[in-house]
């Protein structure tokens, strides 16, 4: 790892290991101000290894970033035993449950409902797992309209329509994610809104 990646991993590891939860079911959270070329996917996976996480869920508004997450996991020798689950790739039922895995998906897909207003059948398994960590990639990216435009510009019409149906607002927070986890890792190259709002305290931020 580069020095800045190692610094981010070390600070996050120490916070997660030493911070006590106020309640048993509380989730700890940490924010990385991951500027361009920081190498957030590689550093995130190194943190997962150091924390000994086995089940990691990566959620993003922009499915187009999947390739970066998938390639870093599959092509680097450090993660040779890890498996990668995605919408159009390997599925949960196909993996070796004894080995660690990463599931990549979009907010709009995992928060979307079927016609009956219930969790989509294909995503039910993800709601039955207590994840070691949920990584929120570019979570604080822009306003609702900026997010919608960015998704539309990728040409992925299904994701765009799903985003509009879910109706994710600018005040969207982790409490409405119907999936449980012990840790949240927020990744953002533009975390200004989160920093200004006081959502994170200094010990929860790598800047």
Residue ranges and their predicted role:
Residues 41-77, 109:
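Conserved Walker A/P-loop ATP-binding site and its immediately adjacent core
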Residues 175-176, 182-183, 194-207:
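Interdomain helical connector at the RecA1-RecA2 junction of SF1/SF2 helicase-like NTPases
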């Amino acid at each position: 790892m580069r020095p800045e990646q190692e610094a981010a991993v070390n600070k996050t590891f120490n916070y997660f290991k030493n911070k006590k939860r106020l309640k048993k079911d509380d989730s700890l959270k940490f924010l990385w101000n991951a500027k361009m070329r920081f190498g957030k996917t590689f550093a995130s996976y190194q943190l997962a290894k150091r924390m000994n996480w086995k089940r990691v869920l990566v959620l993003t508004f922009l499915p187009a970033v999947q390739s970066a997450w998938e390639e870093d996991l599959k092509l680097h020798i450090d993660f040779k035993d890890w498996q990668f689950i995605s919408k159009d790739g390997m599925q949960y039922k196909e993996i070796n449950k004894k080995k660690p895995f990463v599931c990549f998906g979009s907010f709009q897909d995992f928060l979307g409902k079927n016609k009956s207003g219930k969790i989509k059948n294909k995503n039910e398994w993800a709601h039955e797992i207590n994840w070691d960590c949920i990584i929120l990639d570019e979570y604080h990216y822009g306003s609702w309209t900026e997010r919608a435009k960015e998704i539309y510009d990728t040409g992925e019409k299904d994701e765009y329509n799903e985003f509009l149906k879910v109706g994710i607002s600018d005040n969207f927070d982790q409490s409405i994610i119907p999936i449980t986890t012990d840790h949240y890792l927020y990744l953002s190259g533009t975390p200004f809104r989160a920093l200004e709002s006081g959502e994170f305290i200094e010990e929860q931020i790598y800047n």
